[in-house]
Amino acid sequence: IDLIINLTIPSAHKEIIIKSLFNGKHCFSEKPLAMNFQEGLEIQKLANEKGLYVGCAPDTFLGAAGQKARKLIEDNRIGKIVLGTFNLMSHGMEHWHPNPDFFFKPGAGPVFDVGVYYITQLVNLIGPVKQINAISGTATNERTITSQPRYGDKIKVETPTTLMGSLVFQNSAKV
């Protein structure tokens, strides 16, 4: 075994990645890589010391649609990108996931679970971000599961569930 694929809940990612590295294994993890920036630095430092690779989702930007969009931009087929927008709205994971609790814990929530796909694609297409402005909130401190088998159970919300932001890229594009 050369590579460990880590598909655990977010709060377990660091522990699994660190154990993989200590055992001489490369690791590819589900998102997020770590619960905070400091944990990410610890993982990076250990991987470098061990001469091992650590990768993390999302890797969807490497797919056909993302690569086609990147090629169109690189070939100047669509012109200069100056402004953009993206929106993601849903009822929440408690409406379809059979065990949605971890989505409402620190290290999860809409940005870490789904928004990261959009942000990664934007960085891939437009380039590095130089400024971020954001606000977040939580509409309610408790959610009711409406999917089986836990229909009616309550979940404590421990992470923001509503987020708005703007990104200013180094090339001055704004999304």
Task: Locate predicted features.
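Alpha-helical elements of Rossmann-like donor-binding domains used by nucleotide-donor carbohydrate transfer enzymes
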Residues: L3, E15, E42, K68-K71, ...
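Active-site beta-strand termini and strand-to-loop segments that position acidic
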Residues: P160, G165-S172
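Rossmann-like NAD(P)(H) cofactor-binding subdomain of soluble oxidoreductases
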Residues: A12, K25, P32, G55-F61, ...
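Predominantly a Rossmann-like dinucleotide-binding segment in NAD(P)-dependent oxidoreductases
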Residues: T60-K156
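A general structural motif
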Residues: G24, G51, G79-I81, V129, ...
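A short helix->loop->beta-strand "cap" motif at the edges of active sites that frequently abuts
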Residues: N23-K25, K50-L52, Q170-K174
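Rossmann-fold dehydrogenase core element
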Residues: E42-D59, I78-F86
